Amino acid sequence: MTGGNRGVGREVCRQLALLGFGVVLGSRDLRKGELAAKELDPEGNRIAACQLEVDNSVSVAAMADWVKGRFGRTDVLVNNASTMYDRWATASNADLGTVAEAIDVNLFGPWRVIHALLPMLRSSSRPRIVNVSSEGGSIATMTGGSPSYGISKAGLNALTRLLAGELARDGILVNAVCPGWPDSEAHPGGRSLAQAAASVIWAVTIPNGGPSGTFTRDAQLFPW
């Protein structure tokens, strides 16, 4: 789980541990990751924290080596880490440096992690890749705001489709999910964390032979 120390990522870690999964909680700040893991799993039986910066190839490679050395396997990858909800910007006035930073984290970040973990995923009997996207990445519903975030998430959706087609022969199911905005000061009246996490859990737990290459919310297709 990338970006697992807070918000929806943290809740997904909690729910996966309750379902019996062994969870690697990736966090840019290892101390915060270790604190989250301790709070979610005081006995340390199900959740282990790992330092991970998805925009840093060295960090991603170190994470993959650590996972292989400690667990020897990866069955599920949830790409949750993201950045730059630039609701103040429009496509006509966006700072392209900011756009590049968002793409590096929100698109290239998951891509790096997939490359690093793919050998272990290919060896799994039940491999899954879940890319946490957003309605902001839905081309069908885009308007004029948040260009960095929207374009990077639309790219993540495209990557989901490409990988689903390529990796079908390996039995790897690749899906994108839109968890919806959780309730917060920035988004009052949003979904509970449990509701938002449910879409991710669904994509993790679908059986072999299930759907791949989809973009869903609450297990229902969402407009591309």
Model feature map: region roles:
Residues 1-24:
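Canonical Rossmann dinucleotide-binding motif of NAD(H)/NADP(H)-dependent dehydrogenases/reductases
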Residues 19-35:
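Conserved glycine-rich Rossmann-like NAD(P)H-binding loop of the short-chain dehydrogenase/reductase
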Residues 30, 51-62:
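The beta1-alpha1 cofactor-binding region of Rossmann-like NAD(H)/NADP(H)-dependent oxidoreductases
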Residues 45-46, 66-79, 85-87, 173, ...:
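A glycine-rich helix->loop->beta "capping" turn
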Residues 78, 113-117, 121, 159-160, ...:
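Hydrophobic positions on the long internal alpha-helix
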Residues 83-103, 111, 122-169:
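Catalytic loop of short-chain dehydrogenase/reductase
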Residues 169, 176-179, 184-224:
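C-terminal helical subdomain
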